[in-house]
């Protein structure tokens, strides 16, 4: 109901005023619909909002330059153009390269999900279009943002390094090198801590779960110093904060994506997309030391 004629979406719904966010906010209708289907077997959101998804993707494409999504304008209903949101101090969420790689990886993932949705809905004619767009964008992401000499993407933050691997933009021949570089950055630059914001936590946990990297996540979760979940608890938090230092909201959903890691990685319970609603699922616990 909130979608504009040109396909633009607000960052919140209902939309009584100009709210801040970025592509992850207004494009959420795509992963939300897909994950509802995968986890509950409920197709209704996909059926109802498939045309909305298509229209929004067209809107995003209208702001592509040389094959990459670039900043769209603020409007009376939507402000800002975020990549990640509220990472720890010392990480610049306004770094243009970081914003661009995060948002283009998200768009690439959206193409892939819409192709899957089209298959489920029997819209076979649409599938090649979205698959081709996804492959082209993945290629462009790697071409533009990868520094071959240093084996790093964009600003080399955790989300910048992980997201291209998660969406398949990183060639398989370079995957081991990029992963090693990620671990180097995490251990050195970030002193073994989680170093992402709202968007990055979900990306980090998805990648770690898929790649059996439970020790990597667990090592960061054990840290009691800033930034981290135990730091929140040790400083009186009973719910997750909006920022790692607790400066803003004390009741927020910014970092809640870590919850899925306990279920899907530690317990190892993951759905089978081919049998949605847990009609068939996998149990593959990823045990950690300590």
Language model features with spans:
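Alpha-helical repeat scaffolds
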Residues: 174-183
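Amphipathic alpha-helical segments of tetratricopeptide repeats
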Residues: 62, 115, 142-143, 184-187, ...
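Extracytoplasmic/secreted proteins, especially bacterial periplasmic and envelope-associated proteins
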Residues: 28-31, 35, 48, 52-55, ...
């Amino acid at each position: 109901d909130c979608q504009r004629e040109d396909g633009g979406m607000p960052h919140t719904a209902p939309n009584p005023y100009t709210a801040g966010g970025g592509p992850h906010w207004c494009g959420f209708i795509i992963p939300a619909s897909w994950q509802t289907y995968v986890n509950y077997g409920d197709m209704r959101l996909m059926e109802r909002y498939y045309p909305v998804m298509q229209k929004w993707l067209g809107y995003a494409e209208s702001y592509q330059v040389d094959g990459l999504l670039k900043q769209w304008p603020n409007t009376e209903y939507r402000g800002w153009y975020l990549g990640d949101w509220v990472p720890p101090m010392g990480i610049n969420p306004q770094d243009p390269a970081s914003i661009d790689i995060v948002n283009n990886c998200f768009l690439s993932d959206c193409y892939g999900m819409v192709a899957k949705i089209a298959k489920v809905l029997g819209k076979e004619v649409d599938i090649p279009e979205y698959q081709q767009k996804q492959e082209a964008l993945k290629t462009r992401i790697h071409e533009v943002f990868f520094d071959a000499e240093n084996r790093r993407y964009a600003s080399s933050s955790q989300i910048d390094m992980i997201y291209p691997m998660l969406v398949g933009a990183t060639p398989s021949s370079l995957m081991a090198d990029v992963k090693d570089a990620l671990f180097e950055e995490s251990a050195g630059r970030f002193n073994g801590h989680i170093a992402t914001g709202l968007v990055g936590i979900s990306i980090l946990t998805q990648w770690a779960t898929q790649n059996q990297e439970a020790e990597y996540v667990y090592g960061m979760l054990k840290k009691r110093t800033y930034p981290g979940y135990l730091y929140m608890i040790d400083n009186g938090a009973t719910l997750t904060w909006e920022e790692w230092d607790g400066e803003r909201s004390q009741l927020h959903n910014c970092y809640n994506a870590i919850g899925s890691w306990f279920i899907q990685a530690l317990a190892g319970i993951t759905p089978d997309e081919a049998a949605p609603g847990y009609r068939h699922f996998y149990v593959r616990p990823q045990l950690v030391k300590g």
